[in-house]
C-alpha cells in the first residue's frame, strides 16, 4: 500500500505549474466520438488516472486513441464504425464516463452505458441526463445495471434543468449538436469547463451559443469533424495550491492562474487575511501569520465550488475563531472531517453545515482519503500539523492531481510517497521527479 508521508511545519515558497483541467478534458474526450471526419487532437492534457480510464472507455467503443504523455498530447480518431456499448468494466470505475452517452446517442442513435461509479460523494443521480435525452426524442430503458437510449433521429427541444448539473449540461449539449432543429437548454451549468467543451464543439462544426450563461442554444448540424484544442487550466488544482500557500504561511505564485475562474475563492482567501496579488504571469498567495474565520456556502458556478469545499474546511480549521461551511451541492461531502478529527480538528456538523472551531493544535496521524478532494484536504492539514502525517487511499488523489507531492516538495514541503508492506513497514520512497 502506498502512503504519503508528511512532516508538517514548512511554509510553501516558489512557483507552481498548473495542469489542464480534469473536469474539462474528460467530456471533451467523449465529444471526440461525434467527429465522423478527422481526428480530435488535444494538448495540455493532464496525466491522470481518470484520463487513462476514459481512454480505455473510448477504446472499448472502437475509437483509436494515442496518448503522448511527454507532450501532454492526446489524439482521438472516431472516424470508423463505433461500438454503442460502454462496458461495466470501465464505466463502473469512473462517474464521468456517463458523458459518452450523449455523443453515442447522437452519432449512432443507440447508446448502452453501465451505471457510473467513481468518488463516493452522495447519490449524484443521472436523472437529469436521461430526461434531457427523452426530451430530444430518445427512448430510455434501465436494466441489469445498464442504461440504454435509442432514437432514430434526435429532434431539438426546449429543456429546463431542475438543477444546473455540469454533467447533464455537457451530455445534453453534445447530444443536441447532431439533432434536427434547435435545442434550448435553460438553467444550465455555467462552469469554465462548459465553455471549454462548447469551444471544442464549435471548432468541430457545431453551432453552440450561450455557453457560460444560464441558457445554451444549439442548432443541430448533420456532421462534425476533427479539430485541435488546448485544454483550459484546472481551476481546482490552482485553488488547492492557493489554499495550501495560505495554510502554511507561504508565498506561492500559481502560474497562469485565471482570476475570473476563482473569484469566490480569492475573495474568501483575502477575507481570511491572505494577500492575493495578481501578477503578469499568475496569482501570488501570501499566507497571513493569523487566519481570520469565514462563513462559506458552496453553490453552482459562479458561486464557491463544491470541489474546493474539503480543502477550504481544512483552512477554516486553522483560523482564529469559529467558521461555518455550508454544502448545498452534494450530500455526504463532509466525510474528510472524521479523518481530520484524528488530527485534533474540532467541529460540529448540523445538517448541511459544519461549524469549525479554530485554531486546533493539529497533530500528525494516519488518515485515509474518502475521495479526490478529501485527499487534498488531508494533505493540506498534514502540511501544517505537528509531527508526521500518513495519508492513504492515494488512488483518489491520483485521479485529479498530477505529481502532487513532487510539486509540493519543490515548494519546500517535507513530503514523500512510499510503499508499505502489510505489516506497515516502509519499503521504498519515490524520488522527486
UniProtKB/Swiss-Prot annotation:
It comes from the Bacteria. The keyword Transferase applies. Its EC number is 2.5.1.7. Phosphoenolpyruvate binds at residues 22-23. One of its GO terms (biological process) is regulation of cell shape. Keywords: Cell cycle, Cell division, Cell shape, Cell wall biogenesis/degradation, Cytoplasm, Peptidoglycan synthesis, Pyruvate, Transferase. The modification 2-(S-cysteinyl)pyruvic acid O-phosphothioketal is found at residue 119. Pfam families: EPSP_synthase (PF00275). One of its GO terms (cellular component) is cytoplasm. UDP-N-acetyl-alpha-D-glucosamine binds at residues 95, 124-128, 307, 329. The active site is at residue 119. Its main location: cytoplasm. Pathway: Cell wall biogenesis; peptidoglycan biosynthesis. One of its GO terms (molecular function) is UDP-N-acetylglucosamine 1-carboxyvinyltransferase activity. It catalyses: phosphoenolpyruvate + UDP-N-acetyl-alpha-D-glucosamine = UDP-N-acetyl-3-O-(1-carboxyvinyl)-alpha-D-glucosamine + phosphate. It is found in: Cytoplasm. The keyword Iron-sulfur does not apply. Belongs to the EPSP synthase family. MurA subfamily. HAMAP family: MurA. Cell wall formation. Adds enolpyruvyl to UDP-N-acetylglucosamine. This is UDP-N-acetylglucosamine 1-carboxyvinyltransferase 1.
Amino acid at each position: 500500500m502506498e502512503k504519503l508521508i508528511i512532516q508538517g511545519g514548512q511554509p510553501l515558497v516558489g512557483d507552481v505549474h498548473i495542469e489542464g483541467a480534469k473536469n474539462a478534458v474528460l467530456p471533451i474526450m467523449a465529444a471526440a466520438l461525434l467527429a465522423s471526419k478527422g481526428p480530435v487532437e488535444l494538448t495540455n492534457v493532464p496525466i491522470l488516472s481518470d484520463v487513462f480510464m476514459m481512454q480505455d472507455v473510448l477504446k472499448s467503443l472502437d475509437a483509436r486513441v494515442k496518448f503522448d504523455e511527454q507532450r501532454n498530447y492526446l489524439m482521438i480518431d472516431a472516424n470508423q464504425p463505433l461500438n454503442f456499448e460502454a462496458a461495466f468494466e470501465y464505466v463502473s470505475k469512473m462517474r464521468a464516463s456517463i458523458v459518452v452517452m450523449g455523443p453515442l446517442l447522437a452519432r449512432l442513435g443507440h447508446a448502452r452505458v453501465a451505471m457510473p461509479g467513481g468518488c463516493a460523494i452522495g447519490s449524484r443521480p443521472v436523472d437529469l441526463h436521461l430526461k434531457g435525452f427523452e426530451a430530444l426524442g430518445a427512448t430510455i430503458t434501465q436494466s441489469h445495471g445498464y442504461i440504454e437510449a435509442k432514437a432514430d433521429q434526435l429532434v431539438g427541444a426546449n429543456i429546463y434543468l431542475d438543477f444546473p448539473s455540469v454533467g447533464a449540461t455537457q451530455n445534453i449539449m453534445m447530444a443536441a449538436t447532431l439533432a434536427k432543429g434547435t435545442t434550448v437548454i435553460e438553467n444550465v451549468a455555467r462552469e469554465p469547463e462548459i465553455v471549454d467543451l462548447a469551444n471544442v464543439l464549435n471548432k468541430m462544426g457545431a453551432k453552440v451559443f450561450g455557453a457560460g450563461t444560464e441558457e445554451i442554444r444549439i442548432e443541430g448540424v448533420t456532421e462534425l469533424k476533427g479539430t485541435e484544442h488546448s485544454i483550459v487550466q484546472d481551476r481546482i488544482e490552482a485553488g488547492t495550491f492557493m489554499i495550501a500557500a495560505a495554510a502554511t504561511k507561504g508565498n506561492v505564485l500559481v502560474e497562469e492562474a485565471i482570476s475570473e475562474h476563482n473569484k469566490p475563492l480569492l475573495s474568501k482567501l483575502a477575507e481570511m487575511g491572505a494577500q492575493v496579488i495578481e501578477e503578469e504571469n499568475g496569482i501570488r498567495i501570501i499566507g497571513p501569520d493569523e487566519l481570520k474565520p469565514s462563513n462559506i456556502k458552496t453553490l453552482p458556478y459562479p458561486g464557491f465550488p463544491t470541489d474546493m469545499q474539503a480543502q477550504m474546511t481544512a483552512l477554516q480549521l486553522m483560523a482564529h475563531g469559529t467558521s461555518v461551511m455550508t454544502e448545498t451541492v452534494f450530500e455526504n461531502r463532509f466525510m474528510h472531517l472524521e479523518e481530520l478529527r484524528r488530527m485534533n480538528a474540532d467541529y460540529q456538523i448540523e445538517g448541511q453545515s459544519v461549524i469549525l472551531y479554530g485554531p486546533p493544535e493539529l497533530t500528525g496521524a494516519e488518515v485515509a482519503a474518502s475521495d479526490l478532494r478529501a485527499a487534498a484536504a488531508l494533505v493540506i492539514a498534514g502540511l501544517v500539523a505537528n509531527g508526521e502525517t500518513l495519508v492513504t487511499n492515494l488512488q483518489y488523489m491520483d485521479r485529479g492531481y498530477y505529481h502532487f507531492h513532487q510539486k509540493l516538495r519543490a515548494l519546500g514541503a517535507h513530503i514523500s510517497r512510499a510503499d508499505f508492506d502489510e505489516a506497515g513497514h516502509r519499503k521504498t520512497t519515490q524520488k522527486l521527479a
